UniProtKB/Swiss-Prot annotation:
Catalyzes the condensation of (S)-aspartate-beta-semialdehyde [(S)-ASA] and pyruvate to 4-hydroxy-tetrahydrodipicolinate (HTPA). Its main location: cytoplasm. This is 4-hydroxy-tetrahydrodipicolinate synthase. InterPro entries: Aldolase_TIM, DapA, DapA-like, Schiff_base-form_aldolases_AS, Schiff_base-form_aldolases_CS. Its EC number is 4.3.3.7.
């Protein structure tokens, strides 16, 4: 079952190449710490700067490392429907449990174009699909009405909502039904998101604080919002500090401070400034991570 704390995994590099040994260790650590799912090659996995071959290699490596212990929701989005079909078919072939598919970016499809794109992906395979709606990056915003029509397809099972609009959860419950999975795509607002009916978060911060994020999610899902608020207060400085610069760069730096992963990223991303490093260090101390 897809719910709870689901890290959008970083993709480790070593001297410019994929570091699959470290990736597999991160998968084991995440599962041991309580993460309830994994998303390889999303935005946080630096998918824009991976080749198609690397993209597929990372998906397969995470599926193999997870070995059925938690669901793997493979990043399979593209602004080309043809490329999206290739990626989602590969994810299905290697044993992913679902695919995370971002709304096509840059070419700005209409709502009719979004319907056609996601319908084509749905019809090309038997893999469950989670829509990824992130208008801040893709420029297009899937409306609750369009999502409701897509939710009628049997394998469109949910959404990662990164609109930052908490009211969308209630609107999408109305258009898609209460059983449609709604996962927050924004760590800082995940508390309110779940209070409105969400069931989890595809998280950047969970790369660094998987146990805290998992326990936070568990508290919300059992309706214990007093405990969840205590976790929120502990994690909020880290949510903010990680995103002072691109979030995946912050997450990799924090992981490097824990001795779990290099902070190496690919251009055009660059390493953090010293003031941001200091903020992340302070937030990690506040959370009790270092």
């Amino acid at each position: 079952m897809i719910r709870g704390s689901i890290p959008a995994l970083v993709t480790p590099f070593k001297n410019g190449e994929l570091d699959l040994d470290t990736l597999k260790k991160l998968v084991d650590w995440q599962i041991a710490e309580g993460s309830t799912g994994l998303v390889p090659v999303g935005t946080t996995g630096e998918s824009p700067t991976l080749s198609h071959e690397e993209h597929e290699t990372v998906i397969e490596a995470v599926v193999q490392a997870a070995a059925g212990r938690v669901p793997v929701i493979a990043g399979a989005g593209s602004n080309s429907t043809t490329e999206g079909i290739r990626l989602i078919r590969f994810a299905e072939r290697v044993g992913a449990d679902a695919a995370l598919v971002v709304t096509p970016y840059y070419n700005k499809p209409t709502q009719a174009g979004l319907m056609a794109h996601f319908t084509a992906l749905h019809d090309c395979c038997n893999l469950p699909i989670v829509i990824y709606n992130i208008p801040g990056r893709s420029v297009v915003d899937m409306t609750p009405e369009t999502m409701g029509r897509l939710a009628q397809l049997p394998r469109i099972i949910g959404v990662k909502d990164a609109t930052g609009k908490i009211e969308r959860v209630s609107q999408q419950r109305a258009s898609c039904g209460a059983e449609f999975l709604q996962l927050s795509g924004e760590d800082a607002t995940a508390l309110g998101f779940n209070a409105h009916g969400g069931v989890g978060c595809i998280s950047v911060t969970a790369n660094v604080a998987p146990r805290l994020c998992a326990e936070f999610q568990q508290a919300t899902l059992r309706g214990d919002y007093a405990t969840a608020l205590e976790y929120q207060d502990r994690l909020m400085p880290l949510h903010e500090a990680i995103f002072l610069e691109p979030g995946l760069v912050g997450a990799k730096y924090a992981l490097s401070q824990l001795g779990l992963c290099s902070d190496e990223v690919r251009l055009p991303l660059v390493g953090l400034t010293d003031p941001t490093k200091a903020r992340i260090d302070a937030a990690m101390r506040h959370a009790g991570l270092i």
